[in-house]
Amino acid sequence: MIFLNTFARCLLTCFVLCSGTARSSDTNDTTPASAKHLQTTSLLTCMDNSQLTASFFDVKFYPDNNTVIFDIDATTTLNGNVTVKAELLTYGLKVLDKTFDLCSLGQVSLCPLSAGRIDVMSTQVIESSITKQFPGIAYTIPDLDAQVRVVAYAQNDTEFETPLACVQAILSNGKTVQTKYAAWPIAAISGVGVLTSGFVSVIGYSATAAHIASNSISLFIYFQNLAITAMMGVSRVPPIAAAWTQNFQWSMGIINTNFMQKIFDWYVQATNGVSNVVVANKDVLSISVQKRAISMASSSDYNFDTILDDSNLYTTSEKDPSNYSAKILVLRGIERVAYLANIELSNFFLTGIVFFLFFLFVVVVSLIFFKALLEVLTRARILKETSNFFQYRKNWGSIIKGTLFRLSIIAFPQVSLLAIWEFTQVNSPAIVVDAVVILLIITGLLVYGTIRVFIKGRESLRLYKNPAYLLYSDTYFLNKFGFLYVQFKADKFWWLLPLLSYAFLRSLFVAVLQNQGKAQAMIIFVIELAYFVCLCWIRPYLDKRTNVFNIAIHLVNLINAFFFLFFSNLFKQPAVVSSVMAVILFVLNAVFALFLLLFTIVTCTLALLHRNPDVRYQPMKDDRVSFIPKIQNDFDGKNKNDSELFELRKAVMDTNENEEEKMFRDDTFGKNLNANTNTARLFDDETSSSSFKQNSSPFDASEVTEQPVQPTSAVMGTGGSFLSPQYQRASSASRTNLAPNNTSTSSLMKPESSLYLGNSNKSYSHFNNNGSNENARNNNPYL
């Protein structure tokens, strides 16, 4: 009741001013911005043909000095004696309801009222006896969800059946959970997870690196999903939900820097586009950052959704300044996100894409600089040639290629949403071309990588009934494309396609259905539900812990989509339902984000401090380690058990196929030993420096000097012995004599593996314990 009196007095002052009988004076606001206050920045109309409308309405109440400061530009056609009915709605509940006759206030100018224009900037002091009764929590609770509605009736309308005017003001206290002190620590911790993964992989703890990398990427996916969900153009997003989700827009590249915004403005204008000026003029515009429900019963009361679509009073377009300068600008979805980030809508696409490209540039330059630093330290003999960084020095080129795929899959939701949305905006011809190019490049990289993974996996299934054999035995392929599939079980490598499809569909519908909030919310909920059910059913990730981690993330995503389904007002539920859901959304996501961040911090700390963090993880059940070329050390006579285990693994692989398939494979691979090296290949990486295809031959291991055999991969070791100067090849004659008579070229290639040696029945039979699965596991960051 207290603030109702304050608000009513402000409105009454407006009526007095337009009648010409009241005093008004321009006032300089000397109250600090951080002082306790309540404010409203727009006056919304909540009925057809309202006789009071406002194109600008800015009112602030400061309890410390009991002062109301207002700046109003409105028009009224009210005449005669009027009765006012005022309501205070807090979190969807009607907590106060007051009715009074303007004539009872004793102001001649208010009884009767006169039509006219209201254009005033002034102040008014409220009695302290009134302001002291207002609850103090209203000034401190973040993202206050409260609004005041005032309906005017003719004095003789005692039944309140025919309202003359209906206006509504959204209240705020300036406190919010949207803060850089939440956004940037979250971003920093997420980045630390990825950096820690790279570091521990270099020093040899591959299992730890794989799990940290997988969890870090899942963390990014969660943050991106939350940011994308917040971009849906639903009917009503309560303040606390809108503010909290704004903290994660950095994951979409939505980061405001003044100098870059100036560059983007210039670029838009220089390429025959028109820059938006809403943010630059927000102090003189009346803006509602989202549609608001206005009733405890339902948002359909007073036809509020229909009124906001009234083009005579409201506009949702930022492209016509002459339009929104005389009307109330209603922002929702991506428009709201851009406004809350203080980014002009015309710069939204460029902001997200440029920050992604900048991050990509920094990562690539850092990798090159690190390579140069290692070379300098090695040449200065500060770093040993055989240090843990040798594999990076030798394979830094392929590491950069793998990094491009890694960043592409992380940025795919961001790039696809921003590019497709830009197609609907056409801010300038050049920006549209930029959107096409960047979308084609990122999509092309992922499509290429996905096709390569599917070809390799299907070939391995056809030859060995096990996709892990070729996916993990070809170290060059693993190093380049491994990030696309190593987080999944070997037989679930195909889950890469559902994951990319899920990300693309979400981005597509959020981008193109900005003006269809109800349909958009329903489609996104169905997509989330379908993906969550499939994820729980198939459980494609590499182990139980990672599956639980990802299922929990997508469960929260599903709940968020469910909440936004209600925010779209599809069910016309009471406003209190949406308000309570918003509070639950904030608490749920805040607690869950805190858990994920603490989990990342603890995992990274243990990885850096634990003497051997790999012991915390169980071996992969798909036995992928067995198919990776092992490290062969000097023979010391302690190799009996290991050689028997090797022969057993080879025998197991042989029993996976029938006799006809085995003969076909033996004959085919034997042909390949003497095949022309110029055989055409579909892809350029079918032959690599790490491959054994043209160097494998059926000679006994005792015929050559024992040498360490290490795969040339940044994730597998320090290089194969066949590349070293001391490597002794079998003579050409020996290989020719042992090869089959039929030397025709075959399209099939020999898998890079120490388990198969062509047509010979002989195999390497001398291994010691240092060449066991543990060595391979410690030199592969994906395991």
UniProtKB/Swiss-Prot annotation:
Biased composition (Low complexity): 688-697, 768-783
Protein name: Flavin carrier protein 2
Spans annotated as Disordered: 681-783
Principal cellular location given in the protein's record: endoplasmic reticulum
Ranges in the topological domain labelled Lumenal: 23-182, 233-347, 424-430, 514-521, 569-581
GO MF, one example: FAD transmembrane transporter activity
Further comment found in the protein's record: Present with 414 molecules/cell in log phase SD medium.
The species this protein was found in: Saccharomyces cerevisiae (strain ATCC 204508 / S288c) (Baker's yeast)
Record's subcellular location: Endoplasmic reticulum membrane
Residues of this chain annotated as glycosylated in UniProt: 28, 65, 81, 156, 323
GO biological process terms held by the UniProt record: calcium ion homeostasis; cellular hypotonic response; FAD transport; fungal-type cell wall biogenesis; protein folding; sphingolipid biosynthetic process; transmembrane transport
